[in-house]
Swiss-Prot record:
Gene3D superfamilies registered for this protein in UniProt: 3.40.1280.10, tRNA(m1g37)methyltransferase, domain 2
UniProt-recorded name of the protein: tRNA (guanine-N(1)-)-methyltransferase
Catalytic activity: guanosine(37) in tRNA + S-adenosyl-L-methionine = N(1)-methylguanosine(37) in tRNA + S-adenosyl-L-homocysteine + H(+)
Gene it is expressed from: trmD
Positions with a binding annotation for S-adenosyl-L-methionine: 108, 127-132
Length: 240
């Protein structure tokens, strides 16, 4: 996958040189290029200006971003604009982006964008109902969530398929050595060696955590008969 990032602050992306995303670049599975669109700004390198009609703050001008975009977008890639008014990002969105061969991220700053910039964009994405200083942190979050889903980036595909949200449910609790720590013990079923009992325990724990913490995820979840029975058991225990 190739990713191009239009930003005023390329240095903010240093964390992408480490961990999973950094290893993906080392393996040749990922290429990330940073483009400071201030370098293409006319008018003494000014990238922002006052909004027509008045108002608070400054807007990013169209010219620097268009000129930068023209230099890098030979094809018609997926172009992502980070915007609090965009579609909310989730695991399903990450899985969709991971199928792409090329992505371009436009990271804003200041009060907002000249609306004409959005004619370049295929996706407007938000992380949630809150405001960040700029689009850089949001872009890094989306890139991390997306890149780890690219085949061969993570050693075992099952490693991310078991993650929270990948199955539609929150992930079950996990434990490692020692068996007991400060009076807290690992559930005995996990030491039993009985694979079916372990599978059922994990499924029940995932359902329980999802029902208690994110019941909204269950509204459109496609239950198996086994899952329906387990959820009814969980609900009856909760009401007893």
């Amino acid at each position: 996958m190739k990713i191009d990032i239009l930003t005023l602050f390329p240095e903010m992306f240093a964390p992408l040189e480490h961990s999973i995303v950094g290893k993906a670049q080392t393996k040749g599975l990922l290429e990330i290029n940073y483009h400071n669109f201030r370098e293409n700004a006319e008018k003494a390198r000014h990238v922002d200006d006052e909004p027509y009609g008045g108002g608070q703050g400054m807007l990013l001008r169209a010219q620097p971003i268009f000129d930068t975009f023209d230099k890098i977008a030979a094809k018609k890639p997926r172009v992502i604009l980070l915007d609090p008014a965009g579609q909310q990002f989730n695991q399903s969105y990450a899985e969709d982006l991971a199928q792409e061969g090329e992505l371009i991220f436009i990271c804003g700053h200041y009060e907002g964008y000249d609306e004409r910039i959005k004619t370049l964009v295929t996706d407007e994405i938000s992380l949630g109902d809150f405001i960040l200083t700029g689009g850089e942190l949001a872009a890094m979050t989306i890139i991390d969530a997306t890149v780890r889903l690219i085949p061969e980036v993570i050693g075992k595909e099952a490693s991310h398929q078991d993650d929270s949200f990948s199955s539609g449910l929150l992930e079950y609790p996990q434990y490692t050595r020692p068996y007991e720590y400060r009076g807290m013990k690992v559930p005995d079923v996990l030491l039993s060696g009985h694979h079916e009992n372990i599978r059922l325990w994990r499924l029940e724990q995932s359902l329980r955590k999802t029902w208690e913490r994110r019941p909204d995820l269950l509204e459109h979840y496609q239950f198996t008969q086994e899952e329906k029975q387990l959820l009814e058991k969980i609900k009856s225990e909760g009401s007893s």
